[in-house]
Amino acid sequence: MPHEELPSLQRPRYGSIVDDERLSAEEMDERRRQNIAYEYLCHLEEAKRWMEVCLVEELPPTTELEEGLRNGVYLAKLAKFFAPKMVSEKKIYDVEQTRYKKSGLHFRHTDNTVQWLRAMEAIGLPKIFYPETTDVYDRKNIPRMIYCIHALSLYLFKLGIAPQIQDLLGKVDFTEEEISNMRKELEKYGIQMPAFSKIGGILANELSVDEAALHAAVIAINEAIEKGVAKQTIITLRNPNAVLTCVDDSLSQEYQKELWEAKKKKEESAKLKNSCISEEERDAYEELLTQAEIQSNISTVNRMAAVDHINAVLQEGDPENTLLALKKPEAQLPAVYPFAAVMYQNELFNLQKQNTSNYLAHEELLIAVEMLSAVALLNQALESSDLVAVQNQLRSPTIGFNNLDEAHVDRYADALLSVKQEALSQGQDTLSWNEIQNCIDMINNQIQEENDRMVVLGYINEAIDAGNPLKTLDTLLLPTANIRDVDPDCAQHYQDVLFYTKSQKLGDPKNVSKVLWLDEIQQAINEANVDENRAKQWVTLVVDVNECLDRKQSDHILTALKSSPSNIHNILPECANKYYDTLVKAKESKTDNESSEGSWVTLNVQEKYNYYYNTDSKEGSWVPPELCLSKESWLTGEEIEDIVEEVTSDYIREKLWSASEDLLVRFEATTLGPALREEFEARKAFLYEQTESVVKIQAFWKGFKQRQEYLHRQQVFAGNVDSVVKIQSWFRMVTARKSYLSRLRYFEDHKNEIVKIQSLLRASKARDDYKALVGSENPPLTVIRKFVYLLDQSDLDFQEELEVARLREEVVTKIRANQQLEKDLNLMDIKIGLLVKNRITLEDVISHRKKLNKKKGGEIEILNNTDNKGIKSLSKERRKTLETYQQLFYLLQTKPSYLAKLIFQMPQNKSTKFMDTVIFTLYNYASNQREEYLLLKLFKTALEEEIKSKVDQVQDIVTGNPTVIKMVVSFNRGARGQNTLRQLLAPVVKEIIEDKALVINTNPVEVYKAWVNQLETQTGEASKLPYDVTTEQALTYPEVKNKLEASIENLRKVTDKVLGSIISSLDLLPYGLRYIAKVLKNSIREKFPDATEEELLKIVGNLLYYRYMNPAIVAPDGFDIIDMTAGGQINSNQRRNLGSVAKVLQHAASNKLFEGENEHLSSMNNYLSETYQEFRKYFQEACDVPEPEEKFNMDKYTDLVTVSKPVIYISIEEIINTHLLLLEHQDAIATEKSDLLNELLESLGEVPTVESFLGEGAVDPNDPNKENTLNQLSKTEISLSLTSKYDVKDGEAVDGRSLMIKTKKLIIDVTRNQPGSTLTEILETPATGQQELEHAKDMESRAVVDSRTPEEGKQSQAVIEDARLPLEQKKRKIQRNLRTLEQTGHVSSKNKYQDILNEIAKDIRNQRIHRKLRKAELSKLQQTLNALNKKAAFYEDQINYYDTYIKTCVDNLKRKNSRRSIKLDGKAEPKGTKRVKPVRYTAAKLHDKGVLLGIDDLQTNQFKNVMFDIIATEDMGIFDVRSKFLGVEMEKVQLNIQDLLQMQYEGVAVMKMFDKVKVNVNLLIYLLNKKFYGK
């Protein structure tokens, strides 16, 4: 890759042949080649940077660019850049390069290069520059392609489409290694380097007449520039043939200077490059400025002049002039907005002043104007109070705000609206960038404070609940809590008050919140502080008063009572003595128990809390002391208060009576009262008698006065009409404004409540609409319109679909790879076993090992068909064959009857292989819901067919081995159900295996033999017990019965655990297995109506437990239930434990009791019966599952509306075999001549060969291993995009359902843009121009989304054409379709076509379900892939383990001492340096020890003449035993300690040696251990 300004890197060394260094010819040639490589790397870097600018995308490093361009993706993207009408992104093959990264180049990558060449041809680039397709794809001449890119860049620059390519020669550095590598590459391909310097001249020679005139004009400009006369230069620039724009005569001097400098620079660069080239060979444009370069320099001068003008205008301070200057195209600045002219002026002027040079460069203006324009749009949105627009503007990347959190954009917008209103009220039109940023920072701080306070709120509530005062105090003192006036001394009281407050809140049912909020906590703290002050005041009063009484200071009592700010009011100085005397008397009455009193004064506050004060230490506390003895002799606060109030009230009462004594006397003496009352009553009686007259007089007088006032007021109004009108208008205005401002203040004061109410209303409305959509039988159109957007397919939908497709491919590929690897490993296991038994040679094993490693390492090369003659070649005939195969497999997928019949037409061995490979491959191993749905339909059809034709009795399902049941179990125990079995059984199985102390053996004879072996092994003496016993005899021994009972108890406990795991995990059971169990039960009931429920459930149990779970329990290592290391295995005890559990569960599932030979286990029969009841309920619930149509939300029309076509990955061999089988059994599976299957098979013709499938030339005909190569290539997988032969392609529906789907899409498009309460109203109302425009925009947006859709996910051409129709034409087409649908009975105009609206509502509901299911499928596929990867890793460990074993064998073969034993760690047993002495015994001695039991045809007294020599061999565990009779060697046998241990494990007590010597196996093992192993 290029590096800039690094001294350690290399640049080329140019020079003449005569140099000071006096180089040799070889050295000069070497330097020339190095310079060529460097120049070519520079051209690569130039092309890379130019393409990155055009594509706005990063390209591979320079040294990797050639390889990165071979797939043509970047070239096709470049073609899309300069010829977008010819090349679209959807036409670019492998646009994301996922296939290229995964499996390298594919022949279809050449399509990208062809599109690039055609695009260059379309814009008129001379073909002399074009490379060949093979130059790019096969890397035959990559420099030619780079040469073409340079020519294209210059051509596009002249057309004004692309920027000019840079000249980087001598400006970038490369390491010596990079230059050398490039030189070697160029030499390797023998490529002649193109003349990059002559591109300009060649383009000029290829120009038309008009372009020749352009060439002449450009030369004239260059000559004028050379002369240096500005006026002459401006004349040549004005020449129309030069096609130059924006030439300003006033800038002639600047043009001359800029162009002259550019020309001199180019001449110097040309001289440097062409020092060794003759002038005849040079290109004219190497020294002359091209038209594009001249235009570029003119634009540069214009831009500089425009920037100068902008800086000058900013100094003048006129916003309008500033706006005009910014708008000039020569300035090359972003768009500006007139309404923000003042802001541009002020902000840019301030920015100019901050600059040290008092000048803004173009780059600074570019950034500033772009940001200010974004701020202007934001201010505009704020003025219109458009929250959505404000939020969108805040998200704009050009505005560049810091710390903008997407989640809080709505709060920013609300805050900015408030700030904007305040600014407008103060006369400020726009908010500056800094003001907006400050507002954002303020909101961020508020949010942070709120979050912090919520956290600390939780801490405080937790501390309150914990009841720890110190912890509560710590949380209250946290700075983020912001709790005021917290006194550490009051910690206990704070805890008490807060706990009481929270308890009250919890007890109030009206309170929804069950925590204390910060305002409630602050209120409680304030209340506690008040309590503290009150308590201290009372303590001061009590102490002062009691001390005053103790000291008998009567003159100080008034001061003590007044100085304490307590609740005692109206303390009168006149009563001082009375206070003192009364208090003394009260205190004297309490001094009886003075000797036993303490020093504590207790004060009760609010009748809830106690405050404790120590009179000795003068300290108070809310915490109860350990020993609280009250000071009984002192008066309490309440007593003092009562006494003072009583004395004061007595005194006041006495004074009141004294003051009122004279008044009472006078009142009693007066006699005026009765006379006045008598006079008043007389007057009232008179008026009552004259009521009518009084009323008339009053009415007349009031009317007269009112008329006088009205007439006077009328005269005043008549004389001041204008004033009256003005006053009235002002009053109305003031009243309205007051009402408005009052309402506004009310809204401001209740903003939070208003927002909540609005949110609740919107939410309620949305809920009502959703309920109507979901729950209503006939949802109205107005509701449906609100939710139709949910039917849109987003980019995320397409990405998820692609990811699902990718994972499906990976899962299917990994399953097949693991299956093949497992077969090879099993074969390897067998071969190693045969090696151990000496049945095959080590060379055979090594040969298979090489094949295995070759597969594991992926060394088998899968050939790509690049000769355009294979099944996927671009020929019409091959394409038709491919499409027919795709239609054939689609038919087999969707019509299960064909495969169901085919399965039963084949022999058992062929059908099993067919099911394991072709069928599961055809359904992608049910890697998605569609395939799982279809596979279940096949299972159902095949199972019903098998039961109908092959099952004669109910028990045949249990006793036989039904093909479909075997297929279902095999599938659900495979990759799809493996995780289920692991989750279901792994924990309990692992627990059983890891329990080393667990021993379950329910065979009495085995228990007996193990007991006898144990006795003999421990004692070393022969047991007196018999070795061969029956079950009944074994059970007579108490030891055996005890061990058996212990085993049964252990068995019951362990079985409970396994049963519990199974019963509780019903939901984990695969749906497919449960559904087939349901089908099995219903099919059996249908064929055998007399079968009882018990019989049916036993059959279900046979499927679910015996066939599916039982083998996994017995052999968990074989079904990947537990993880096993390579070479690891389950020992015999563990396997027996698992087998015992499985046996009990099997009996329980079939409700079979222990009888007959298992009579000794009859104690478990009650347990079996109870367990069966649990199983019975489990089997019933297992069958309670919905139909696949409901479960997967699918039907036969689902494929018509899915985003992507179904794809399967199948090998060539499987395609050929399937084709062959279909032809072989065609008459049986497609009986009707008009059957579609017959039509497809007829189209395909004969079964093709592998070679014809791959295409001619795929295999060398002279290859001696042609057959092996073809066999290997037949396993090559290809992808088939399945399609129906009768897909709708011509725009006409084949049935009412398809027409319904098309009509629904059209209705959805129309209802988006045209309002109306019913469909009929919309269709009858003409669309406005605005609605047509909005509809066109929507369709354009959809077309953009569709353009990014992968080919396999694109909709049919008919649907696309319908989408392009104008609104009115769509409505007419809807009306036609609705009439057709009404004739077929699908809709009715009587209910205003509500049926089709109901279908749309159903689609909306199902879309959410589909997305949810797709996410679940993604997760499920990922889990399956992870499990498969783990399994593959285990197989690789197994391969490595076998490698170690075989390598050890090879190493040992190379040694001369082949007799030494082989171990898996590669180490041989050390060869002894001394000969081992034999152990010698007479037969009589061995007989005495109990080892030897007898010798055939020899008396016991002759045993002393028989001698046995036992010799340890060099092989570990192997012993030679020689026998001698009377000193003569008779025979020799070899003992293997492993064989003896196996016999002991199997319970064999006696064995024969030399065919006549009977020995005790247990005692022989004991003897060998003692003599040779010291144990």
Swiss-Prot record:
Every WW domain range: 594-627
GO annotations of cellular component type: cell surface; cytoplasm; filopodium; lamellipodium; microvillus
SMART domains: CH, IQ, RasGAP
UniProt name for this protein: Ras GTPase-activating-like protein IQGAP2
Gene Ontology process terms (BP): Arp2/3 complex-mediated actin nucleation; regulation of actin cytoskeleton organization; thrombin-activated receptor signaling pathway
Modified residue annotations for Phosphothreonine: 356, 782, 881, 1002, 1269
Keywords of this entry: Calmodulin-binding, Phosphoprotein, Repeat
Domain (Calponin-homology (CH)) ranges: 41-156
One Pfam family per UniProt: CH
PANTHER family reported in the protein's UniProt record: RAS GTPASE-ACTIVATING PROTEIN WITH IQ MOTIF, RAS GTPASE-ACTIVATING-LIKE PROTEIN IQGAP2
UniProt GO MF annotations: actin filament binding; Arp2/3 complex binding; calmodulin binding; phosphatidylinositol-3,4,5-trisphosphate binding; small GTPase binding
Residues of the Ras-GAP domain: 933-1182
Residue span(s) of domain IQ: 690-719, 720-749, 750-779
Phosphoserine modification, residue list: 16, 595, 599, 1279, 1461
Function in brief: Binds to activated CDC42 and RAC1 but does not seem to stimulate their GTPase activity. Associates with calmodulin.
